[in-house]
């Protein structure tokens, strides 16, 4: 199956993760709920390693491909924090925390990276390591 079809199969989950993260914004290094959600998902996807608590709330996942071990590694990253802004839009997934909002896209970036991690962990049709 082409990769785009595989990713499309997970679109509803990716959207739900984004909406959940958007509704529960956290600032700077105090992204404990978001970090726990990310770590839980990465572990459920079957990553080779999931390390938490980096720089207080950072999360790192490691996925090793099934190809010949070339020793190559690529890093994918996303910020998880929100901004100290009051959300005034009336959406079903509107911020539930006064004075905090995902106004810069980190909720979407985190959800998309979770989708990529899920796809890579399920397929592993690459050579090297993704961190």
Language model: regions and residue ranges:
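Acidic/His- and Gly-rich active-site-bordering loop/insert found
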Residues: 1-102, 111-114, 118-127
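Divalent metal-dependent hydrolysis catalytic cores, especially in the metallo-beta-lactamase
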Residues: 129-131
């Amino acid at each position: 199956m082409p990769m785009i079809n595989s990713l499309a199969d997970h679109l509803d989950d990716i959207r739900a993760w984004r909406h959940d993260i958007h509704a529960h914004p956290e600032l700077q290094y105090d992204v404990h709920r978001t970090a726990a959600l990310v770590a839980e998902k990465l572990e459920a996807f079957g990553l080779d390693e999931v390390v938490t608590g980096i720089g207080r709330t950072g999360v790192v996942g490691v996925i090793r491909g099934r190809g010949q071990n070339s020793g190559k590694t690529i890093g994918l990253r996303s910020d998880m924090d929100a901004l100290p802004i009051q959300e005034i839009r009336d959406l079903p997934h509107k911020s539930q925390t006064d004075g905090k909002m995902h106004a810069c896209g980190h909720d979407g970036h985190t959800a998309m990276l979770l989708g990529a991690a899920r796809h890579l962990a399920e397929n592993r049709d690459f050579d090297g390591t993704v961190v």
